[in-house]
Amino acid sequence: MRYIKTISMIALLFSFSVAEDLPLGSSIPMADIKMKDINGRQVSLNSVKMENGLLVNFTCNTCPWVIKWQDRYNELAKASQKNKIGFIAVNTNAGKRDRGEDMKDMKKFAKKYGHDFLYALDEGAKLASAFGAKYTPHIYLFDGNGKLVYRGAIDDNPAKRKKVKKYYLMDAIKAVGKDKSIDLAETKAFGCSIKFPK
């Protein structure tokens, strides 16, 4: 009986299906799905995409790793803008909307950290599921043709900005802006697991 209960609990835990991580070269998934941002606007990935591409940052308000990386978010958004790459942060913790991850919390969080970029809510974590995203933060960078050219982490040291040695995402942004190949197109994303709805 205990064995059956254990199996049932495991089945329940994995009842929300998440796709495999989006392969490099893939097109933007669910590019036209509408999401509400903290300013009340309806936005889609296609509406955010610019001439040279799109950067999607799956993030949240409550993950300690996200908070550690906050001092780099605006810089990355500005670099994206400079290189004609659209930038959007997407709150995908649909399983914690009542615990610090609803729209009101997003507005407070953005104000606290001085966000200067789009921050939208992923209803039901549908977008994150389509991407196969599993962590916050989890980065996906697309080129001007809407093809995935980088995925993974922001850099190699979330805890201390001054000790970063490898600027994975910044290097990728600059390469895309200059229409050059990315030296390291895939890194291991790490952070908190996305809280998908049950």
Residue ranges and their predicted role:
Residues 46-67, 173:
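Short active-site neighborhood of thiol/selenol oxidoreductases, capturing the structured segment around
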Residues 141-198:
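Thiol-/selenol-based redox modules, centered on thioredoxin-like
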Residues 50-54, 82-87, 114-118, 144-145:
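Loop/turn elements at helix/coil->beta-strand transitions in domains of secreted/extracellular proteins
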Residues 67-112, 121-130:
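Structural microenvironment flanking redox-active thiols in thiol-disulfide oxidoreductases
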